[in-house]
From Swiss-Prot:
GO terms for molecular function: ATP binding; magnesium ion binding; pyridoxal kinase activity. Its EC number is 2.7.1.35. Keywords: ATP-binding, Kinase, Magnesium, Nucleotide-binding, Transferase. The keyword Nucleotide-binding applies. This is Pyridoxal kinase PdxY. It comes from the Bacteria. ATP binds at residues 114, 151, 184, 211-214. Pyridoxal kinase involved in the salvage pathway of pyridoxal 5'-phosphate (PLP). Catalyzes the phosphorylation of pyridoxal to PLP. The keyword Nucleotide-binding applies.
Length: 288
């Protein structure tokens, strides 16, 4: 029997709705990955509602929880770490310490850093210290990074002028250490208004993917968290990078189709679960 992969997901959690782990854990489980959720914050709801309650996890709790997993002899069974929204740079450093411990216990373990800073239409949501940490420290450790356009712009200190410029910016981030960069949401002058575009960039090649852009009265939150989680999960399940990239785009589109059909603000993950596991649509990544 083929072993089920195990993934430690260190990101935010909301009690109501879907963001961070609340957007990613169930879909990752649904496609066949055992997920160990470690919540960096626990909020009542995501912050686009403009009001919320809850608390940020103290940075020292992250190594303490990883110590607990090590104490029961399970740390070496962790195949990957996924990190998302950080409440502080100190939280980020605690995560990198945990990644180092896991890679020592399992040298094949992977680390995907989703450098959450905000959304091109919603603005930056983290302090400058977190942005600096992600670029100067996390990028050197991560196997994969999955920025959106706002985050890529922040890393580059400028906005792109074209698709080739987006590619150059992604390659500059790649040069800091990761094996692959997935740009989850491209935005550049001249981009078709009816398309949603993504990039996959490695040292050897790059691929561009376009899918239809779906209209919503209010853009759902958690799409980037869902994207990063599914991409890493498909890698753990045996996909190559391009296959994981294409699957992720299709599965996320299926969720958005269901969400749009229901007129929902929150992602319709439960209703779309079979289409997450077996997308009916397919989008081809074109090599650039």
């Amino acid at each position: 029997m083929k072993r089920t992969p195990h993934l430690l997901a260190i990101q935010s959690h909301v009690v109501f709705g879907h963001a961070g782990n609340s957007a990613a854990v169930f879909p990752m489980q649904r496609i066949g990955v055992n997920v160990w959720p470690l919540n960096t914050v626990q909020f009542s709801n995501h912050t686009q509602y403009k009001q919320w309650t809850g608390e940020v996890l103290a940075p020292q709790q992250i190594p303490a929880l990883i110590d607990g997993i090590a104490a029961i002899g399970e740390l070496g069974n962790c195949d990957a770490v996924l990190s998302g929204y950080l409440g502080s740079a100190a939280q980020g450093r605690a995560i990198l310490s945990g990644v180092a411990r896991i890679k020592a216990a399992n040298p094949k373990a992977l680390y995907l850093c989703d450098p959450v800073m905000g959304h091109p239409e919603k603005g930056c949501i983290v302090p400058p210290q977190v942005s600096d940490f992600l670029l100067e420290e996390a990028a050197a450790v991560a196997d994969f990074m999955c920025p959106n356009q706002l985050e890529l712009d922040s890393f580059s200190g400028r906005k792109p002028e074209s698709l080739p410029d987006c590619l150059a910016m992604a390659r500059a981030l790649l040069a800091r250490g990761p094996k692959a960069i997935v740009v989850k949401h491209l935005d550049y002058p001249g981009k078709a208004a009816d398309g949603f575009e993504m990039l996959l960039v490695t040292a050897e090649a790059s691929w561009h993917l376009r899918r239809p852009l779906l209209a919503f009265p209010r853009q759902p939150v958690g799409v980037g968290d869902l994207t990063s989680g599914l991409f890493l999960s498909r890698i753990l399940l045996g996909d190559d990078l391009v296959a994981a990239f294409e699957f992720t785009a299709a599965a996320v589109h299926e969720v958005l189709l269901e969400t749009q059909a229901c007129g929902s603000y929150e992602l319709e993950l439960v209703r779309a679960q079979d289409r997450i596991a077996h997308p009916r649509v397919k989008f081809e990544a074109v090599r650039l």
